[in-house]
Amino acid sequence: MTSTSPRAFGVRSMTAPLRRAVLRIPAAVGDFEGAGWRPPDARLLLSQHERLAGLLEALGVEVIVLPPLGGLPDACFVYDPVLVTGAGAVVLRSAKQVRSGEAEPLAAELEALGVPVAGRLTGEARADGGDMLWLDERTLLAGRGYRTNAEAHRQLAAILAREDATLERCDLPHDRGPAHLLHLMSVVSPVADDLAVVFEPLAPVPLLEELRARDVRWIAVDPEEYATLACNVLAVRPGVAIMADGNPRTRRALEAQGCEVHVYQASELSKGDGGPTCLTRPIHRSG
């Protein structure tokens, strides 16, 4: 698509209209087992990713598709290596060793797209973007678990303070342990200012209390559909969302709340346990 503001950037919302987003073509070859994937069909994996990009474009998003990154299977999950704020990209440091080479290349690609580096985690700080979501334009909620540590919280709070934003902390459960993925956004996806989807059995109590305090209603995802990523829903704009196909109960519940729901075929993309929010790095939301 052609953008009217080709270098526009800034994200301080999970549901404001998505103007620009980055996706990365999945690696067709690589150590999928070492990265924790179930073996995908490479041809279908690439086709499904292309169709997801096309769906976003059809919904009015300017999509920039980046090339595969050095045979790294997880590199297609572009939400995790950086956090985009109102000031630019904060370069994160992954606690998953096989993802340690993703952040700096993505930061350089974003700079070429007009998104400046607003900060970098250093030293012992470790964090994934999947542990972070904007509660409002001045408040970032960050999970504390096996992927994001307390030192990252400390450094992120200092970076956010430079743009008059604050960080709230939320401890995550052990679930199945450090070898298995559990991000904050594994258990919650905002869909509109007053609506989210939540997997209650793993949702931290402070998260639910925060949603209630903000008058946010939520749809409770059941365990069967949680396993097929029904809790991973990307808001394109308030009440318009993208989710993986094969989750009819959650889809119907969203539609009953007045949402417009679009689905994509995800049989291969989901083999790395990532949904549309993981596969999409918003770089500009506004309106």
Identify the function of each model-found stretch.
Residues T2-G287:
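The feature marks the mature, well-folded catalytic cores of soluble enzymes
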